[in-house]
Curated annotation (Swiss-Prot):
Keyword Repeat belongs to the record: no
Gene that specifies this protein: ppsR
UniProt keyword annotation of Transferase present: yes
GO molecular function: ADP binding; ATP binding; phosphotransferase activity, phosphate group as acceptor; protein serine/threonine kinase activity
Name of protein: Phosphoenolpyruvate synthase regulatory protein
Pfam families attached to this UniProt entry: Kinase-PPPase (PF03618)
Binding residues for ADP: G157, V158, S159, R160, C161, G162, K163, T164
UniProt EC number: 2.7.11.33, 2.7.4.28
Residue intervals passing through the bilayer: none
Family: Belongs to the pyruvate, phosphate/water dikinase regulatory protein family. PSRP subfamily.
Catalytic reactions of this protein: [pyruvate, water dikinase] + ADP = [pyruvate, water dikinase]-phosphate + AMP + H(+); [pyruvate, water dikinase]-phosphate + phosphate + H(+) = [pyruvate, water dikinase] + diphosphate
Function as written in the Swiss-Prot or TrEMBL entry: Bifunctional serine/threonine kinase and phosphorylase involved in the regulation of the phosphoenolpyruvate synthase (PEPS) by catalyzing its phosphorylation/dephosphorylation.
Length: 277
């Protein structure tokens, strides 16, 4: 077995496999192991299921260690094939459904693709999410200041502090219309809140970042430039943080947080509703 990998982990589904991945990752994060992840969506027929079984078995015979298999599969005949494999198989949905079935005295009615598929009941939500993504792309990095009043949140910050990925995550994951506005080097001589943003102060949220981390990120983009110098980064961060304090704009330091964590903190602090898709 590869010394760099402790366990091989499969995430298998007859749908997108997003549920299997999310729950499986949450479980595996509890263990101090290095994993090699394999995600296999749309395992919807017996021939594909047998190919997946063969893949699991091949890794077992190669390594001598049972692969871990997190699966979410509706059709019993497909499940049965996966369960014949040499993997340690866990039905991540059924583990929760069974006790709920007992508590609610209701039988589940599993349908493939129900969680992340399109159906007449969720088309409006899907359209709203696409509209949020379109809006966010059109208002990235201060490209357009039109219709800013339609934003649910407007992220502020220096270049490369995480505004764009956070905005896109908010739009794609939660259907939030997120604009973002950059403060650039030329702004620093007299940094003030732009007039176009003042009426929308209740929608503003600031991001900052440790200067050392900012310099490292910028160095990858523009090596040996003034833009990436630690001195420049320290000055910009100090100026922007002073602006946040002066205007009472809520803000967080993004240095040690993932995009998911940053987005969740913004939703919580700004009181924005989470939408599930």
């Amino acid at each position: 077995m590869d010394n760099a990998v402790d366990r091989h982990v499969f995430y298998i589904s007859d749908g997108t496999a997003i549920t299997a991945e999310v729950l499986g990752h949450a479980v595996m994060s509890q263990f101090p192991v290095t994993i090699s992840s394999i995600t296999l969506p749309f395992v919807e027929n017996e021939s594909r299921a047998r190919a997946v079984k063969d893949q699991i078995d091949a890794i077992y015979h190669q390594t001598g260690v049972r692969p871990l298999v997190f699966y979410s599969i509706v059709l019993p005949e497909i499940r049965a094939i996966i369960l014949e494999s040499e993997g340690f198989c866990q039905d991540i949905v059924q583990a929760l459904v069974a006790p709920l079935q007992q508590e609610m005295k209701l039988d589940p009615t599993p349908i493939a693709h129900r969680t992340h598929g399109l159906n007449p009941n969720n088309l409006n939500k899907y359209d709203a999410r696409i509209a949020a993504i379109d809006y966010t792309l059109a208002h990235d990095d201060g490209i357009s200041l039109r219709n800013l009043d339609q934003a649910q949140v407007i992220l502020l910050g220096v270049s490369r502090c995480g505004k764009t990925p956070t905005s896109l995550y908010l739009a794609m994951q939660f259907g939030i219309r997120a604009a973002n506005y950059p403060f650039i080097a030329d702004d620093m001589d007299n940094l003030v809140l732009p007039a176009s943003l003042k009426p929308l102060q209740h929608k503003l949220f600031g991001l900052t970042i440790d200067p050392e981390r900012l310099a490292a990120i910028r160095e990858e983009r523009r090596e040996n430039s003034r833009y990436a110098s630690l001195r420049q980064c320290r000055m910009e961060v100090a100026e922007v943080e002073a602006l946040y304090r002066k205007n009472q704009i809520p803000w967080i330091n993004s240095t040690n947080y993932s995009v998911e964590e940053i987005a969740t903190k913004i939703l919580d602090i700004m009181g924005l509703s989470r939408r599930m898709y």
